[in-house]
Amino acid sequence: MPPIVNNLLENDLYKFTMWQALLHSHPEAQTEYEFVCRNAPAYPLSELKADVERELDHLCTLAFRDDELLYLRSLRFMKSDFVDFLTVFRFQRKFITVAADGPALRIRAIGPQVHVMGFEIFVLCIVNELYLRRFDQQASLTEARRRLQEKIRLLKNFGKEATRKNPFEFFDFGVRRRFSAAWHEEVVVTLAREVPQYFTGTSNVHLAKKYGLTPIGTMAHEYLQAYQSFGVRLRDFQKAALEDWVQEYRGDLGIALTDVVGMDAFLADFDLYFAKLFDGLRHDSGDPIEWGEKALAHYARLRIDAGSKRLVFSDALDLPGAFSLYRHFADRTLTGFGIGTNLSNDTGIPALNIVMKLMACNGQPVAKLSDSAGKTLCRDETFLAYLRQVFHHPAVK
């Protein structure tokens, strides 16, 4: 079968934006990323080891093509020196290892952050597609197409509802857990054709380039987590990360992620300066209604018109959930909805809940204190307890 990954642009936009920011601010950072499967697969993922090794061998032969680099240069927030770096960039096979750990698959990328952070999305795509190849492909695609048509029907019926102050906008965040590259492309093309009034873009930079769509994304947890090890006082790591982001992008890419140490701790750092500079906030764990109300109350306390800001929701969303959140918030603020697995891998086969997370930076543990049970990741319980103490973040049961 052909390789799963065939071009390096088929990655989330926020991978490039974080990559650029970290290359400029902390090019010397040494990091460790680790693959984790959060749920029980239908068969042991360790059986995929040899195939994953082969796919990674191929990945490390790829380079950015001239037309891909030209596209990145066309994005106003991409700097010429970063694209020049990508011109000579190659993944180094020595930085990533694959091992069977009983029934589990252990994948670790260890090395300079600017050389290993790009592995994440490709590893997830590779594992997910290899895993799903053992299921009935034709039956899966038939069911996936039926479900996609049902989503389009839901969207068209939703259009008959009373108009709200702000429009409903959703976008594709599905590259990391897609059924396959071909199916992901079919989903994006179909939505762009059938419901362009609602479907506003994709995080997949390759598909955005190919179909003239808006590439979507700003930052992920790893960007903020890395600052836990960058020499600032731990209590100040979020402020340092946000400040460097502001200096890098000067008003572009203005959606801040809030749940690295919980929403309450984030808002304590998100003062008038940041609240004015950033265009909005992204929710990725915890109760979305409670989170959104906290965000709006925070803007009100700072005397900022929430109608000029945007709340982006991206935590395990489907369309009915997005509609419900839209109805709740759309008359008070701009909204946006990033839908991933439910778009690119809704086939009837239970999806793997897989991630590849930053676990250490510069020899120190880093952690995310999620607002949802099961999403907190850290190997060092002592550091985790200290982080909870510093940010007054209780364990989520």
From Swiss-Prot:
- Give one GO term, molecular function aspect: nicotinate phosphoribosyltransferase activity
The record's annotation in InterPro entries points to: N/Namide_PRibTrfase, NAPRTase_N, Nic_PRibTrfase, Nic_PRibTrfase-Fam, Nicotinate_pribotase-like_C
Q: Name one Pfam family in it.
A: NAPRTase
Pathway as given in its UniProt record = Cofactor biosynthesis; NAD(+) biosynthesis; nicotinate D-ribonucleotide from nicotinate: step 1/1
Q: What does this protein do?
A: Catalyzes the synthesis of beta-nicotinate D-ribonucleotide from nicotinate and 5-phospho-D-ribose 1-phosphate at the expense of ATP.
The UniProt entry's sequence similarity note says: Belongs to the NAPRTase family.
Listed name of the protein = Nicotinate phosphoribosyltransferase
Q: Which organism is it from?
A: Herminiimonas arsenicoxydans
Gene giving rise to this polypeptide: pncB
